[in-house]
Amino acid sequence: MRKIDLKVLWSLLSALFFAAGTASALYFRLDGDRLWLQAEQTPLVDVLEQFSRVGVGVRLDPSIQSTVTGLILGQDIDEALEALLEGYDYLLTWKMLRGPLGRVPKLKEIQVYVPGSAASARPMPKKSTRFDATRGVAGTSPEFVKDELLVGTRPGTTYAQFQGLLDQIGGMIVEADAATGVYLIRFPTGTNVEALLRQLGRNPLIAHAELNYVTRLPGGLSTGFPSLPAVSPPADGSIPVAVLDSGLDPSAGLAPLVSAGWDAVDPERNLSDPDGHGTQMAFLASGVLAADGFSASGATLPLVSVRAFDEDGKTSNFALMQALAYAEKAGAKVVNMSWGSEVDSEFMRTAIQVAAQQGLILVAAAGNEPTGNAVYPAAYSDVIAVGGVGADGQPWANSNHGAFVDVSAPASATLPSGSYVGTSISSAAVAHALAQYLNQRPGTTVAAARAALAAALSPAPAGGYGAGVLDAAALRRLLNP
């Protein structure tokens, strides 16, 4: 294989790019073991950043200051790189991506170095991943991640058929969620994915496709953890509670409680919390601190901490699906989700159903705007939706309400960063209570735990605040029936 003169095939390339809805100086697409690339005097580091963007680890000899020129159209990546990286050596590491259509090869890492100097390749500095959100061409859509779609295939579809479809529309498989059968597909920058979504809706190979919707964290919390008491490790064999949020700050002093942790946004990075919300929820869900009206139990619980939100407080549905799957594999039995949006996603609904079928008790905040509109994931039937009340048991003024709310709980707490009010706190309080209950009664089913909670509740105020309130008296009844 040889490099192709850009001028000779520029008209062909332009037609291809504009048909895909994009035109830029650098075009990149990687699908399995095939590469599409258009570059003209493009810094090598910029090309390698494109590999990083689709989840490939990159190691580069820092002495290499090279540019890339060439046109590659669906060629074997080994052959393509041999031509494009003439004068340098490279090493490719592969993994098998498991999805509903079987195992497919996915590039795991690429190393580029001076011949004979493989040890000189260093991890290329990686920019923090941020979910690039948009409201679409018309600006009226719920927020979604640019240039991405989530796709599920019909039974009987083969990988070859699906790959042929992706070739037609210029998509590349980035990841697959085995539990739900969903593929994350990425397209070249600037692609009109809304138009492609309509096209896929008419394709007989596709069962369902969605935009990769964005959810934002509620605001109001700050970071900083002054004067924290030392935290003792939980008892051996304790059942962990998972917090799917903005992560965990390593300076918060909660390390003795962490049984597992993962960054679903930047999987190669150590767990952190640029926002602070996740760390504050971890204090409450673990029992180190308690919502107002409760006393900290003293029986701290193990934590499974998953960072699913980026530095701007945004996440995607696919990241949330991956976070749920990790929580289950890490041994959590209760999952706290102190966030939500009004977007009802079929794929998220399926992910929630799968998690519940696997034995997870799912708890989510009803929201901090009293609209009465359903907020998801709280409104899914497999999730305990939690509204907020004040110290007097009356509705917190900004708590959402409605038929989807299952229970209410105190919405205020004094946290290391100061006082805070929100249904995030209510959700974390309920999650901790249920995790305590399960630790007292290992083996309890999801249905039995939910029934025990419902039976213990104090009366709820009228107006859509659930079947009852989890206050201090209700917590005593739950744990000491």
Predicted regions span which residues?
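N-terminal export/assembly leaders
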Residues: 25-119, 172-179, 183
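Protease zymogen maturation seam
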Residues: 122-148, 164-167, 174-180, 191, ...
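C-terminal subdomain of the subtilisin-like protease fold in secreted/lumenal serine endopeptidases
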Residues: 328, 332-337, 346, 350-351, ...
